[in-house]
Amino acid sequence: GGIGVGFSTIVPAQTLGQNWFLRRRALVIGVIFAFGGVVGWLVAPVDAWVLEHYQWRIGWIGIAGVSMVLALLAGALVRETPESMGQVRDGAVPPTEGGRDDVAPLAAISDRWTAAQAVRTPQFALMLVCGVAYSAPFNTAVAHLTLHLTDVGHPNAVAIGLVGTMALISIGGRVMGAAGDWISPQWALAVALALEGLGAGGLLLAADSTLALVAVALIGLGFGMAYISVPVVFSHFFGRKAFSVTTGIRMTITGVLAGLGPWLAGLAFDATGSYTGAFVGLMLVCWAGGACAAAMRHPGSPPAPSLSP
């Protein structure tokens, strides 16, 4: 299952979105993953319905059947690039009012990069920091937020509801990641990480119901925006040819590092009896990532190959 998810969802969907679209690249990727978020949000009620009326085996058979149908449809209908069908990105539509008019020239430069060249750049290293900065706080909140909220006095049902609210708001954040079509995508990422950091710090004030809601909303919104902005920045910097490999490498590294967040937060809580240190640390990690995003600039043309004597 994990291998199938890795091969068939995040990296391929991001790759196809940026292969086919340029001027509305962020919006397209945002819509794709917003629908993924909606499906994820529906899993729990559908799961409960299946268990109430059937049994768990029926649920898994249904998932397998849907997966096979979608795999066949994708194989029959989806094409990797518009050029494979005699088309071009965006259908060669001229820029619309309000969009960025520097996208196409930069894309022509970015498409010259190879993955081997891209992973050696400072921009790639900074994007690894940004990847950890947006995913570690959200992963940690999902794992520990219910316990923290009950510790500060909220009923268990309220705590669970706030965690669900955070996930739901992240869906809207993914659509808001479309801001990267109108402004520099690295600035959209910087704003997203700043918001997520505010939310992580705001969890220190979560004893108040209103402030708890604001905090989880900021985390969800910032995470959703960053989730879309990161692949858009990669496409903006390194183009189509290098995208899938650099994204796979980035997600592997940041997945391991960000996965340590819940574990480290648990260690901090066991040592101190409080989540204060963990939430302050996550806030600083977010803001460090935001600073990295704001500092990044387009890498320009790739280095010319060296000529051996």
Model-derived regions, located:
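Hydrophobic core of transmembrane alpha-helices in multi-pass small-molecule transporters
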Residues: 1-8, 132, 211-225
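C-terminal membrane-cytosol helix-exit motif in multi-pass small-molecule transporters
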Residues: 65-102, 292-297
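Intracellular juxtamembrane helix-capping segments at the cytosolic ends
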Residues: 5-21, 225-238
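Helix-to-loop junctions at the C-terminal end of transmembrane segments
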Residues: 173-184, 269-270
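Extracytoplasmic gate region of multi-pass secondary transporters
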Residues: 116-176, 261
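C-terminal ends and interior cores of transmembrane alpha-helices
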Residues: 195-207
